């Protein structure tokens, strides 16, 4: 039920940016839609209308880090907007592979929907993901998260 997550894709941001960068995000959204969780995504050119805003950068300068998601929360504990940054290169200045970029897109979309990191390396939400398809555990976490009333779950203190 509900409405789709609206995604805005900001072009550019990295010298390596190309139209296929948007394809990684679209494919990542398709992977979550295919997980049969009742989630779906639409794409908008208007960032003010978007729930999730993707932008690109060359590198985070931090090892193989490929993505970061910054969440904005409502007072009632709902994610109101997510800002996702994806890098095209690692700190060693090597281009990320297509699989790494797809995995990062799927992983960061998980964060944008409110999912935390997983301790299981076969999950797309594992911090150093090698996976491009949400696992059974990832899907179960989404089901649990979306079954709870807003504000009943809080991120652990850092």
Regions found by a protein language model. Give the residues of each.
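Residue-level recognition of the N-termini of beta-strands and the immediately preceding loop/turn
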Residues: 5, 50, 121-122
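Short, internal active-site loops enriched in acidic
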Residues: 13, 58-60, 130
